[in-house]
Amino acid sequence: MKVKMSKLIILSGPSGVGKGTIESLLLKNKNLLIKLAISATTREKRRDEINGVNYFFLTVQEFKEKIENDEFIEWSCHFNNYYGTLKSQIKFIQSQNFIPLLEIDTTGAKNIIENYKNKGELSQLLTIFILPPSIESLKNRIQKRLTETNIQINQRLEKAKAEIKVKNLFKFQVVNDNLEKCVAQIEKIISKEIQKT
């Protein structure tokens, strides 16, 4: 498969839509030649997360220093926590002849899309937005995680409604109503798109 290593794949969608599960299944497909660009965050580490595997966990001061040093391809702050993708992660993955996969929120995705558009490099992005079948199903998924209070769940749902409104900024939109079908559809999109020169 002929692949252009400067490509960048963005997988985005509201919290609770299943991005993490989809991403882990995509990464198991070695034919896609993709690797996850691990994000950095200042949020508290969940009990099952590992630093450098799930996220790079940074202090607020460390994160702000990296912002000042222009070390992020994108970053955002929501729910009082910073999230971002380090440029060094992208370069490292590309140096290994893989295509970076970014699983990020819509704010970060919009920032990257705008940046690439301004540089005339939009063709280097493959943007995929994951949609829930409904807001009610999204609420159920978030509640099942047992990591948020009711107030936090409601905040996430309001944010999700706003995020869904920007779905048309993404080249592809895929509804996650059946995990296997959703992953198969995304695999097909990636396989087709990364072969384009």
Swiss-Prot record:
Principal subcellular localization: cytoplasm
Superkingdom classification of source: Bacteria
Pfam name, any one: Guanylate_kin
GO molecular function: ATP binding; guanylate kinase activity
Keywords tagged on the record: ATP-binding, Cytoplasm, Kinase, Nucleotide-binding, Transferase
Localization, UniProt: Cytoplasm
SUPFAM superfamilies (UniProt xref): P-loop containing nucleoside triphosphate hydrolases
GO CC annotation, single: cytosol
Record-listed ATP binding positions: G13, P14, S15, G16, V17, G18, K19, G20
EC number: 2.7.4.8
Reaction(s) the record says it catalyses: GMP + ATP = GDP + ADP
Residue stretches making up the Guanylate kinase-like domain: 6-191
Main enzyme class: transferase
Family annotation (SMART domains): GuKc
Cited InterPro entries: GK/Ca_channel_bsu, Guanylate_kin-like_dom, Guanylate_kinase, Guanylate_kinase_CS, P-loop_NTPase
NCBIfam families: guanyl_kin
Stated family: Belongs to the guanylate kinase family.
Protein role: Essential for recycling GMP and indirectly, cGMP.
Alphabetized PANTHER family for the sequence: GUANYLATE KINASE (PTHR23117:SF13), GUANYLATE KINASE-RELATED (PTHR23117)
Matching HAMAP family: Guanylate_kinase
The protein's name: Guanylate kinase
Natural source organism: Mesomycoplasma hyopneumoniae (strain 7448)
Gene: gmk
